[in-house]
Amino acid sequence: MNLKFLTKLKISIPIPVFGTGCGVLGLSLSKVSLNLGKYASTLLKALEYRGYDSTGGVFQTKNMEVTLLKDVGAPSTLVKTLGIEEQAGKIFCGQVRWATFGTVTKKNAQPHIVKCKNFIYGAHNGNITNTRELKKFLLSEGHNVVSDNDGEMLVHTVEHYFDNELSKIASNEHFIPEKRRACMRQAIINASKKMVGSYAAVIVDPHTEMVYAIKAGSSLYFGIGEIDSNNFGLASSDLTAVLRFTKMLVNLREGEFVEYDQNNFNVYAFKDLKIKRPNQPDLIIKQGSKIEKKPVRSKLRAEDTELIPPFEYFMEQEIQAEIETSGKLIKLFQGGSNTGRRMVELLKRENIHEEMKDIGENILKKDDFQKQSKIFNKFNDSEKAAEFYRKVREEYTSIYDVLVTEGFEKKYFFSTDKNTFIDLLESHFDKKKLLIAKALDSISELSDVKQFQESIRNFLEIIDNSIKNNRNIYTIACGTSFHASKVAALFFNEIANLEIIPCLPGDFRGQYSKSLKDNDVIIGVSQSGETKDLIDIFNDVEDSGLKIKMIVLANNMNSTLGQEKSDVSIPIFCGPEIAVPATKSFINQITLFYYLAIKIAELKLENLKKENGSQDLIRELSRKLDQRYKSIEDIPKLIEDTIATSREGIEYISSKIYMEPSLHILATKMIGVAKEGALKIRETVLNHAEGGEASEFKHGPNTILGKNTVFGFKNVRKMIRYFNEILEKAFDLA
């Protein structure tokens, strides 16, 4: 889809993206580098989508010499005009800002250097909601607060408690590294109790050259690696920024912080933590405890987060990718890809399945690429691998012919570990290596299928229990995920004759939180798995003591919701999304909900059979279920055809109405799609747009119509007739 007409717009108003606004960075190198400014520029520009009303960075060289560069403006501009690109140094602390507390001024830009009681500096992303109270407190304690920015309040608050802790030890011990680090850790714990809000922060003590990255309700990622013969530790609000420098990641949970320099890191809890574990007692971690963690190689590749020609916009690229991502999710429904199943059958026939399975497991256990490559290449060089390749080439030509097609690894690798195996191919094209990598991927894919099917079984058990106890099922989500939940309510009602109640977190808290009962079910939907409002609801439900099961549908399974808060977590498998407007995740969410509705209908049918229900009814329900299972296979092709056939029409209509001041998208039943369409308009061109139930339009919204309102196509009667025909077809499918 060509979006070039949007370049005519000359709008400088930032798009507010609540929950993702602002981004923070902390990079520590093993030695002073002349390239630190270049690294910093790359990182800041990678975070530009999170905020661009101001940009800043602190660069520390040696002997505690620091340079602060910040101003109003976007990273893509300021990295040059501020001279960020030319900076040398050993430590970089940076931030891009979408303004919340404090107007858009240089003073309110981050990072902040403070020296009231002790010399530290830092920045944050998120919101400290008690900023005014903190400012009064800090001023009363003698701090020199120069802005209204909540990031400055955070840095001063840490400084305040850091000074308190240092005052408890002898003055001649203040600069003993171990003592000083212990004081800073306790300061972070104490400061976190004083501050209210959701944030991620980076704090630097220039004396010890230690960096502290704190995850308190906002996304934060940490990785270690080497660049230009320089070891480093890197914290960022954005995963893709870290992946540009390293694939070795350390998973941080909400409530944890990491203390690190270029060579070492340690993770601590700044509050008491209770971690859910499947089929095990909850893991209890006490405040201040050190948490043992090892770096793990990311399953994502940097290429997965890059704009690939001919696309000019991430949103355009991700819309096109819906064909592939929905197809890969559907393959999970079907028990795996055809190529994967055929490969595993071949491995079993040739009696090397177990050996290949062991090789794959050993590769995935290693956190170092060189060690992984050594295992892979050892088997590749073996006589057994040569014999396997010969047999495939001579006796399994259908597999071999597919193997040598262009872009095979992009089209036919499906497992969550696929990028690990693709990386092992390195840059040169080797058919034997490709065959081995595909074999490993196929084994891993079937493992994914088993895990997915187990999650679905657990989901159905929970839903079945809720139905038998006549209890409520709530879906709770924000933004695009909420709109997908509205579509889910339609699917569950039409297909499974089951009511679910879709809620925004605020509505749930106000309308349902006090009336929950045992055997109710909460289904949280989140692309990131880090949606703070949703995490708060899950925490409240858990604290209630009621016997309520909590389910999560998430894209990022290594997340707070995916790993720590849910009884069952189900992946949506849409891959990374870079564009702020969610596209792939919405399609995969509603595809997954459609499948879950079918599975619940199937469950009800099985119960009806056990109860010796009407045979005519059973046959009719079975026929409908078969139709729906077949309709799932058509989804990727339907998306592909829709993109192809509507391209010109969308471009034409968009070019005509993108400057209209107000748009209304009306729906009958499919209100979730209408609301999502309106959100996409607001996110991309900043128009006012609303999506709503068509019958409600006359009850208020029509009062704002005027002579400049766009009502629709010229031939309204013809449009309505076609629209009704489309609706009839849609409802036959639904």
Task: Label each residue range with its predicted role.
Residues L154, I169-E173, A182-Q186, A601-E648, ...:
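Internal, active-site/partner-interface "lid" segment
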Residues F162-L166, F175-E178, K247-M248, G255, ...:
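A structural-propensity feature for long, helix-poor, extended segments
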Residues F5-R471, T642-S646:
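Conserved short alpha-helical segments that host acidic/polar catalytic motifs at enzyme active sites
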